[in-house]
Amino acid sequence: LQWLFAPWIGKVGRRWLMGISYFITNGLLVGLLLELGHMMFRVVAFWMVILLFVMYAALATFILYLLLRRFMARQPLSRSLRLFAPLFVAGLLGFGMYNAYTPVVRHQTVFINKKMDKPLRIGVASDLHLGILFGARQLDKLTDIMKQEQVDMVLLPGDLMDDTVDAYLKENMKPHLQKLTAPMGVYATLGNHDWFRDQKRIKHELEAAGLTVLANQVLEVNGVLLVGRSDDLDRKRPSAEQLLEGQNTQLPVLLMDHRPTSIEAHARLPIDVQVSGHVHNGQVAPANLI
């Protein structure tokens, strides 16, 4: 930032800029530690993403400088790079928003060593975070995708709401969620954001919209054993092994578990497919490549 604004601010201005940046960043972190409101986490997360993108811009600008310094005079190069850096940050933010609002369908074919009358088409979507930023329009997109894919069953492994049902109710999203249907049903489990503050109301609203919420429960659906675990925040939740006790595991077994933290243990159980969410595909690039 000091480099970016150097032509327009003097030494004192650069000190003020450094002080303000330091105050904002550390003030937000202190606010997070003191738990000054639940939205503080989101504000801090957004600010950290901005700082990360600024770091990417600084790296890209430096690389461009190394490549172009032999071909451009100092002043034109300096002006060009000062224009490039903020545009690069804006481009990253715009690309991130585009990705967030543009769902991508990925197809996976899984073969299991259990008898099935016919192949099963399962639609999986997690971490919808229905709230201020994501709502009715995104639900309609999801419904259209599931219809186009002709899924037999829909699984929603957690974080359907963004902490509360306030925005869900205010924006009247229920009719849109009710349109999400499948021949064998729509099933959900609760994730950490469903557990934070409004667990009972979230579960109630999901069920009122026609979803079956599995909270540490097992359900047989057309010859398929469906297991749903609540989030790790449920300290009393039984293990997947305990949930499977006494169940007919000769049937195909599908597990919904919001966080994939126990996937190695589950691999040793008679579970054929586990679907999870939580990780948001690495959250921020380039973590999505890992």
Task: Walk through the language-model features, giving the residues of each.
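Non-catalytic terminal accessory segments
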Residues: 1-101
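N-terminal signal-anchor transmembrane helix
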Residues: 40, 67-125, 131-149
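Soluble catalytic domains of enzymes that build or remodel membrane lipids, polysaccharides, and related
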Residues: 114-290
